[in-house]
Each structure stands twice: as structure tokens, then as C-alpha cells.
């Protein structure tokens, strides 16, 4: 069978919570990336067989946000679309589903990725549909409820990171150092233009005058210092060590790519970036969900007949510094291969988009000298997902 390849991989800049993208729905961020894929590839949009996009915080957007993003992005109405929710793994799961649909013979070319607007997630007034007889009622934050809370233990994702702190005896100093390093790496990469090739500028309409053109990630903090990080209070536990500074942000963004057969790429005159080698998924205790990538990576590597030492680049989502440190310890990863341009602590974590974002960033780093990469994420509820890719060679 023809190999499954990836091409035209892009992402939006990542906006901070309540920042530059606060008035832009997730589906419009997704549409921006889809539009770029179609315009840059110059393929006939009718060639697309399906659009699959991850999106976690869907409430209030309208039916099937992936469908809205696809049509707004220029995909014909005749092309079907569907939306995936695997929490933080949604964007990468969408790409896996595209891969599987092609292997099954259902599709030849798919746009797949993820999108999220955490800024636009609504407040919920539960049990209000049929009215209240008496008493006060409380609004529920859909972002916290559907994106950041472990339903099994009824606590915030930050507590799952604190659980790993205890299990792996991770110090506050280690976490702050990890966060500082992420910020510094991302800042250097941004200043050097490393992200320019993967980022699609986004137009943000203004009340008066021309729209703002946003072309850089909003949340990178080059002025962060170890001392400033050390001054932050624990965010989730009275005597804890997980803070707003050593955890990923709350963000808005989108990322996507073309997934297709090698034969289809040749027929359309497209130059693939990479070959999709394998995927892996895991289930772990929800209370330590952050360790999920370990088994997922092992499974993905085994399916591609590779081991850790065969991998040149790791893009691992930094949900929390503690979680990342635990995964790195378990896998004994060489740190000069991991998130060399920073990760989600600096860049941000728009949950439905991050799976695709990590892979987009990985694809743009592949080279003849570093041809093999792994992208992986932990997933709320106690799961992990990973993929192995290799630089495309004819």
C-alpha cells in the first residue's frame, strides 16, 4: 500500500486567555488554517475527501464546529466533516483518524487538526431549562468543567500534577527551572524566526481602521526569571508546588495539515514533509493522567520498529512542568532532543488544538540530520497519545 504522508502543516499564533483572539470563535481560527492549506497547496478543494478537527469546548458554537470551520475555510459543501473530542489529544486523534480512514480505503486526502477558543467557552446555568422554584443558583464554567477537571476525582488537572510531584519527588526548583527553560527556548526561537514557516497570520477585526495582523505567539515571556517564578504562589494546593508559572496557559489557537497517500501527493504535485509511521495510545489512572505519554510512546515506537535512541526530536506537550519531568524521567529522554524550541508552558495549550500543534512544530524541525520525530500528549481523564513520523524521502 502507498505510504501515508503529511504536507502543508500550519498553525495560527497562540493567543492568551482573553487576549488578541478573545472575540474569534474556534471555528474561525480553524478556518484560517484550512484556507492557508488550500491556498498554499493550490489544490482543487474538491480533491479533499473529508475534514476532521479536534475541538473540546464546543458548547454554544453551533452544530459540528469542524463543519463550520471547513466551509468557512473554503472546503466545498459536498465534503463531509466531523469534530473530535479526546480532550488534550483531540488534534492528534483527528490526524490518527484521518490516517486510519485512508488505510481503510475510505479516503485519499484529508484535512486534519484541531482548534480551540478557551476564551470563548461559555458559563453554564445548569438545571435552569424548566425554571427554579427558589434559592440561589451558581454559574458553572464550561472551560473548567469540560476541559480542566478530572470527573473521576472531582479535582482540577493541577492536582493530577501535584500527585506526580509526590510520586516522583519533584521539587519546586526543578519545576521552575523547567518552566524557565521552556520560556527561554521559545523566546530564542521566536526571535530567530523559527516559527515563521509554521504560523499563519490571523486578521483580528477592529472597531475602527484596518484589522490587526497577528503573526506571533502572544504568551511567550522572555523576561521571565527563576526569581520571578519562585515568587508565585501554589495554584491548586495549599502547600503545593504547581503554579501558574510552571503550568501551561489557557489559550486560543488552531493547527491542521493534509494527510494523504503518497500516490495522491504525487498526482497533485505536492511535496510531502513526512511519513506517518505509527500511533500509540494509553490508559492510566486519572489521578496521574500526566504520565500517559510514557506507554503511548512505547507503543508507537514498537509499532514502527524503533526505540527511544532512534528518535531525533521529541515534541511533548508541556501540560505542567511536573508532568513533563515525570515523563522525561520514565523514558530517560536526552533533554537536547526534547522541545528544543520550548513547549506549552511558553507557547500555550489551546486544548483541542495542541495535539495538532505539537505535530506541526515537529514536522517543521525534521531534516536530513534529524529525520525521526515523536509527538505526544497527556490527556485528562487518564490517557496518552503519541505518533512517530519520519522525514519524507522518495
From Swiss-Prot:
Keyword annotations of the record: Acyltransferase, Cytoplasm, Transferase
Cited Gene3D superfamilies: 3.40.47.10
Coiled coil region boundaries: none
Pfam entry (one): Thiolase_N
Main location: cytoplasm
Keyword Phosphoprotein among record annotations: no
InterPro entries in the cross-refs: Thiolase (IPR002155), Thiolase-like (IPR016039), Thiolase_acyl_enz_int_AS (IPR020615), Thiolase_AS (IPR020610), Thiolase_C (IPR020617), Thiolase_CS (IPR020613), Thiolase_N (IPR020616)
GO CC aspect terms: cytoplasm
List of catalytic residues: 88 (acyl-thioester intermediate), 349 (proton acceptor), 378 (proton acceptor)
Family stated for the protein in its record: Belongs to the thiolase-like superfamily. Thiolase family.
Record's protein name: Probable acetyl-CoA acyltransferase
Organism: Staphylococcus epidermidis (strain ATCC 35984 / DSM 28319 / BCRC 17069 / CCUG 31568 / BM 3577 / RP62A)
Amino acid at each position: 500500500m502507498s505510504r501515508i504522508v503529511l504536507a502543508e502543516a500550519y498553525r495560527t499564533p497562540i493567543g492568551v486567555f482573553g487576549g488578541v483572539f478573545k472575540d474569534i470563535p474556534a471555528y474561525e481560527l480553524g478556518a484560517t488554517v484550512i484556507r492557508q492549506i488550500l491556498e498554499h497547496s493550490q489544490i482543487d478543494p474538491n480533491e479533499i475527501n473529508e475534514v476532521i478537527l479536534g475541538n473540546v469546548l464546543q458548547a454554544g458554537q453551533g452544530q459540528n464546529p469542524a463543519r463550520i470551520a471547513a466551509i468557512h475555510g473554503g472546503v466545498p459543501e459536498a465534503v463531509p466533516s466531523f469534530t473530535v473530542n479526546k480532550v488534550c489529544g483531540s488534534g492528534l486523534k483527528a490526524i490518527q483518524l484521518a490516517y486510519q480512514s485512508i488505510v481503510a480505503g475510505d479516503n485519499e486526502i484529508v484535512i486534519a487538526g484541531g482548534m480551540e477558543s478557551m476564551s470563548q467557552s461559555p458559563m453554564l446555568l445548569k438545571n435552569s431549562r424548566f425554571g427554579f422554584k427558589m434559592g440561589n443558583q451558581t454559574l458553572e464554567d464550561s472551560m473548567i468543567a469540560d476541559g480542566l477537571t478530572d470527573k473521576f476525582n472531582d479535582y482540577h488537572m493541577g492536582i493530577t500534577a501535584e500527585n506526580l510531584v509526590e510520586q516522583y519527588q519533584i521539587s519546586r526548583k526543578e519545576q521552575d527551572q523547567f518552566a524557565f527553560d521552556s520560556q527561554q527556548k521559545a523566546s530564542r526561537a521566536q526571535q530567530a524566526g523559527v516559527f515563521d514557516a509554521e504560523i499563519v497570520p490571523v486578521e483580528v477585526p477592529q472597531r475602527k481602521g484596518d484589522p490587526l495582523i497577528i503573526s506571533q505567539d502572544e504568551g511567550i515571556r522572555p523576561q521571565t526569571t527563576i526569581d520571578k517564578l519562585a515568587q508565585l504562589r501554589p495554584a491548586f494546593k495549599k502547600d503545593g508546588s504547581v503554579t501558574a508559572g510552571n503550568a501551561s496557559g489557557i489559550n486560543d489557537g488552531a493547527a491542521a495539515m493534509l494527510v494523504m497517500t503518497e500516490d495522491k501527493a504525487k498526482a497533485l504535485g505536492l511535496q510531502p514533509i513526512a511519513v506517518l509511521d505509527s500511533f500509540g495510545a494509553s490508559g492510566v489512572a486519572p489521578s496521574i493522567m500526566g504520565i500517559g505519554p510514557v506507554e503511548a510512546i512505547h507503543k508507537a515506537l514498537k509499532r514502527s520498529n524503533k526505540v527511544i535512541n532512534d528518535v531525533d526530536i521529541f515534541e511533548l506537550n508541556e501540560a505542567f512542568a511536573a508532568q513533563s519531568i515525570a515523563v522525561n524521567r520514565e523514558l530517560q529522554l536526552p533533554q537536547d532532543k526534547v522541545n528544543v524550541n520550548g513547549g506549552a508552558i511558553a507557547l500555550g495549550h489551546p486544548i483541542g488544538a495542541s495535539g495538532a500543534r505539537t505535530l506541526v512544530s515537529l514536522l517543521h524541525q525534521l531534516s536530513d540530520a534529524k529525520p525521526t520525530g515523536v509527538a505526544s500528549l497527556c490527556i485528562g481523564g487518564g490517557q496518552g497519545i503519541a505518533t512517530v513520523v519520519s522525514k519524507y524521502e522518495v
